[in-house]
């Protein structure tokens, strides 16, 4: 099992996503799985930023034989940054989602099985149709 930790500020969404992308590449996560995890990470980091742009977030990416887990830890008041909309990338493309508030930390974990059949392209196309 390989694991990488990133400490960053949620106000730097693009920079944080670049760090996560680099971590997923270093962990040899497939392109399709990386795209889904990055889409989910973008939603989550944006939600954290909207709630507390001045705080910090620790992101951990961990790969096992079964898939990849990305965990977001944010200090502060109870706040679950997981998108609730059923058409969100996180809800549609992640195989497991868990949240806990422990010791003043909001911890959200998303897991995607290796080569999951949950296709991010379908979610992107669905969102484009809704926007029109």
Task: Label every PLM stretch briefly.
Residues 1-2, 47-132:
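Conserved beta-strand-loop-beta-strand hairpin that lines the nucleotide-binding pocket
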Residues 29-56:
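Conserved ATP-binding N-box helix of the HATPase_c
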């Amino acid at each position: 099992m390989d694991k990488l930790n990133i400490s960053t500020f949620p106000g730097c969404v693009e920079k944080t996503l670049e760090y996560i992308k680099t971590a997923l590449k270093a962990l040899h996560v497939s392109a399709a799985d990386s795209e889904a995890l990055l889409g989910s990470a973008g939603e989550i980091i944006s939600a954290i930023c909207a709630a507390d742009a001045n705080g910090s977030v620790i992101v951990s990416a961990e790969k096992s034989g079964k898939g990849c887990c990305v965990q977001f830890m944010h200090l502060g008041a109870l706040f679950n940054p997981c998108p609730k909309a059923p058409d969100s990338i996180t809800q549609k493309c992640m195989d497991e989602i868990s949240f806990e508030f422990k010791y003043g930390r909001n911890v959200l974990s998303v897991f995607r099985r290796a080569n999951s059949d949950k296709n991010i392209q379908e979610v992107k196309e669905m969102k484009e149709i809704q926007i029109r």
